[in-house]
Structure formats: structure tokens, C-alpha cells
């Protein structure tokens, strides 16, 4: 199946599902990457992807949920009935967010759309919504103005079962959990998905947030899982820079965004571990770094915050990973005891991460490394089709088939 056909098959009018059957709704960061792919097919459809996300997903407080449940489906768990937010909005949504890459995509669409009237109109419409979302992130998740926001659920990282979350997730109590039936393992080999003990804790957090009626202050105080995720914060820092650029282009006041950028740069660079030569997430509850090397540790390059010396150390680290893995970029250091080459975010290559990290290395002048990240991603898709993720040792496609952001980024990367 061609990349365009994947997007067309997964299109549901104004939004695109990540994969037919496995993921039957609209996901936040998926839609951002998918919009990049639509620009190579239909600029209006690319804008519609993002308009649909904000018009149907965003709450009055600016919060942007990680799932918008546009229609009923029995293929996915937990659905809208479990989240319990049906009364808050139609369509229903989840109660947590996801990496905020969308401002970066809006800037690209604004700058490159050949229809300048449409670009100005759509960007002006989306700018206050983006600003409200970023403002919500800082109010709800950085109340002490550190420049770093916390995630309160592994799903918010986008890297759901990363081994970086093992220890903080182990603190989440599993008590009186209602019986449930996962649907993902009916579509995909269970060996390629998160384990049951992970899901028990994911759901325990969900039910806690539901009891707290999704009150941001209550969640911040009471969530036993509170992590400063280096990947989330790097993506937010890049998004802030792009939001600032949009403000200038649209002649909006950029002062508030500039403050976020200044604090964010200081905060993000504080996550650098000098001894390891790498960026680690921070466990806010335990008050310690999470010393597990994952692909998220390369994302500050996408944000543009490291100095050149740190970028060089990250390039050396990526090259070491590339000596152990046939394909870059594994989601976990292939020499790590946590490395599982076929299980979701514990080892496989993900096309969206390759794209962001390649952008970062390119910006820092590591053209050969950026080229390898691109070439490896394209080779995997050429060989295995547009899969959700890929084994970095064998190249075998894993997870969902006909995966939208893989197809979208293949289109975008080869434009």
C-alpha cells in the first residue's frame, strides 16, 4: 500500500485515525505528524486535521486531550465510558494530554502553504488556541514556574511503556481495579505491547484522575506518578520557539512566550547528566534522575538548547547505538538491560522520533548522522511497509499495520 493510500484509508473526513482497528480515534501528536503528510497531498486537508483537533478536543481552560472520541468503537480500551468525560464535551475526550508538537507543525503549514490568504486565516484562528494550550501546560503542570512541566501519566509522554517509567510507575497502587478487557492484544501480538502489570497501573492512575474530576491542582498534588519527561519538555521548548515565531509573523505579543523559552532552556539543560553525557528525565516524587538512556534523551537537539559540545557527545552516543543496532534510532540504548527490540517503546525504532532527532542533528551540523536516521527510516518502511514501529536489530515491522504517521512522514521526508 502506498503512503497516500494509508492516509486515505485512515481518513475519517476531517481527522485521521492512527491505524484502522487498533486506534479508531483521533490522537493529539499523531494528528500533528499526520498533518505534515497531508501537506504533500492536500493543503486544505492538512489544516483540517489540526482544526478538528482543536475545535472538538480543546477544553475551555485550554487543555488539549490526547484522544478525541469522535465516534463509538469497540476496538479500543479504555474508551470514553472509562474516562467519564462525556458530559464535559461532545465528542468525549480523554483527561490527559500528549507531547505538544502541534505548534511546530502549525508554523510549518503557515510558512509553506502556497495559498497565503488561507495560511494567514488558519494561523490567526489557531494561534490563540495554541497559546491557551501552552498556558494550560504551565499553569497545570509547572505551578512553581521552574520552566519544566511534569507528566502525570506515562501515556502523556507518548512513549507509554518506556523503561524510564518502570520505577516511578511501580509506586502506583493497584487497588480495587474493576475487571477489564484489553483490545490492543487482539490486533497485535501481546509480546509487542505493554504488559498487564503496566496496564493495571495506567488504569489506576486514570481512575484516580476521574475521582478527582480531572482537577489539575488535585492531580498535581495527588498523582503518585510525577515525572519531568525530557522528551515532552524538549518538544514543548521547540514548540515554544515556533509559537514565538508565529507571534512575530502574525504581529501578536510574544512576551509571555519569550518568558517560557528563557525558563525552559535553563530547565531543560538542568536535565543534562555530565557523567553520563546524556539527558535524563527526573522523578519528581523520588527527587532523583531516571538514569535510563532512551531516545527521548536526544530530543533536546530538536529543541535547539544544547551547546555544540553537548551535541557532539549526543552524536557519539547515537553512533554507539548504531554500532549495536542495524537500524537507528532504537527507543532504548541497545546495550541496556531494559532493551527489548520488539516491545513497543522498550527498543523499537519509531519513525516520528527518527524525524525529530534527525532534524536536531541536521541543525547542529551532523549531516551524516541525520542522513542515516532518514535513510534507516525510509529503508524500514520500504522493506516492511508503514508499520507502527520496527525491530532495530532485524528490521521486522511490529505493532499496527498501515500506520498513519509512518506514512505521513515518509511523504513529508521525501517531498
Swiss-Prot record:
What is the regulation of this protein's activity? Activity is not stimulated by divalent cations and not affected in the presence of EDTA.
Q: Tell me the enzyme class.
A: hydrolase
Alphabetical GO biological process terms: oligosaccharide metabolic process; protein N-linked glycosylation
**Organism's domain of life?**
Bacteria
Q: Does the keyword rRNA processing apply?
A: no
**Keyword entries, A-Z:** Glycosidase, Hydrolase
Q: How does activity depend on temperature?
A: Optimum temperature is 70 degrees Celsius. Activity is undetectable below 30 degrees Celsius and above 100 degrees Celsius.
Q: Where is the active site?
A: 160, 388
A GO MF annotation of the entry reads:
Glc3Man9GlcNAc2 oligosaccharide glucosidase activity
- Which residue ranges does UniProt annotate as crossing the membrane? none
The function of this protein is:
Hydrolase that catalyzes the hydrolysis of mannosylglycerate (MG), a solute produced in response to osmotic stress in thermophiles, into mannose and glycerate. Can also hydrolyze glucosylglycerate (GG) to glucose and glycerate, with similar catalytic efficiency. Is highly specific for MG and GG, and cannot use mannosylglyceramide (MGA), glucosylglycerol, mannosylglucosylglycerate (MGG), glucosylglucosylglycerate (GGG) or trehalose as substrates.
How the protein assembles, per its UniProt entry? Homotetramer in solution.
What is this protein called in UniProt? Answer: Mannosylglycerate hydrolase
Species this chain originates from: Thermus thermophilus (strain ATCC BAA-163 / DSM 7039 / HB27)
Write the gene name. Answer: mgh
Amino acid at each position: 500500500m502506498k503512503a497516500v493510500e494509508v492516509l486515505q484509508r485512515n481518513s475519517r473526513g476531517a481527522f485521521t485515525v492512527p491505524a484502522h482497528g487498533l486506534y479508531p480515534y483521533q490522537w493529539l501528536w499523531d494528528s500533528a505528524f499526520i498533518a505534515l503528510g497531508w501537506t504533500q497531498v492536500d493543503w486544505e486537508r492538512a489544516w483540517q486535521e489540526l482544526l478538528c483537533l482543536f475545535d472538538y478536543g480543546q477544553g475551555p481552560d485550554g487543555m488539549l486531550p490526547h484522544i478525541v472520541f469522535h465516534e463509538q468503537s469497540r476496538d479500543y480500551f479504555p474508551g470514553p465510558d472509562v474516562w467519564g468525560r462525556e458530559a464535559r464535551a461532545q465528542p468525549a475526550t480523554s483527561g490527559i494530554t500528549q507531547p505538544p508538537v502541534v505548534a511546530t507543525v502549525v508554523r510549518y503549514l503557515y510558512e509553506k502553504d502556497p495559498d497565503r490568504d488561507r495560511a494567514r486565516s488558519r494561523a490567526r484562528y489557531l494561534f490563540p488556541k495554541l497559546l491557551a494550550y501552552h498556558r494550560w501546560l504551565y499553569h497545570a503542570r509547572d505551578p512553581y514556574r521552574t520552566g519544566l512541566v511534569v507528566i502525570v501519566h506515562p501515556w502523556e509522554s507518548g512513549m507509554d511503556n518506556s523503561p524510564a517509567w518502570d520505577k516511578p510507575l511501580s509506586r502506583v497502587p493497584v487497588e480495587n481495579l474493576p475487571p477489564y478487557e484489553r483490545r490492543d492484544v487482539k490486533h497485535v501480538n501481546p509480546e509487542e505491547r505493554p504488559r498487564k502489570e503496566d496496564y493495571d497501573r495506567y488504569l489506576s492512575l486514570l481512575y484516580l484522575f476521574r475521582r478527582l474530576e480531572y482537577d489539575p491542582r488535585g492531580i498535581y498534588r495527588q498523582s503518585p506518578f510525577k515525572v519531568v519527561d525530557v522528551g515532552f519538555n524538549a518538544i514543548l521548548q521547540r514548540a515554544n520557539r515556533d509559537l514565538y515565531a508565529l507571534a512575530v509573523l502574525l504581529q501578536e505579543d510574544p512576551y509571555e512566550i519569550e518568558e517560557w523559552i528563557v525558563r525552559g532552556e535553563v530547565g531543560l539543560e538542568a536535565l543534562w547528566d555530565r557523567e553520563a553525557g546524556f539527558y535524563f528525565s527526573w522523578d519528581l516524587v523520588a527527587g532523583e534522575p531516571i538514569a535510563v538512556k532512551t531516545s527521548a534523551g536526544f530530543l533536546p537537539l530538536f529543541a535547539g538548547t544544547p551547546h555544540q559540545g553537548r551535541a557532539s557527545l549526543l552524536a557519539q552516543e547515537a553512533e554507539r547505538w548504531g554500532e549495536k543496532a542495524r537500524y537507528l534510532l532504537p527507543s532504548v540504548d541497545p546495550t541496556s538491560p531494559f532493551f527489548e527490540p520488539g516491545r513497543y517503546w522498550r527498543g523499537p525504532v519509531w519513525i516520528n522520533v527518527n524525524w525529530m532527532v534527525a532534524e536536531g542533528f541536521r541543525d547542529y551540523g551532523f549531516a551524516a548522522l541525520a542522513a542515516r536516521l532518514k535513510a534507516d527510516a525510509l529503508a524500514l518502511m520500504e522493506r516492511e511497509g508503514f508499520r507502527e514501529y520496527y525491530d532495530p536489530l532485524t528490521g521486522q515491522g511490529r505493532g499496527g499495520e498501515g500506520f498513519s504517521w509512518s506514512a505521513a512522514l515518509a511523504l513529508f521526508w521525501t517531498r
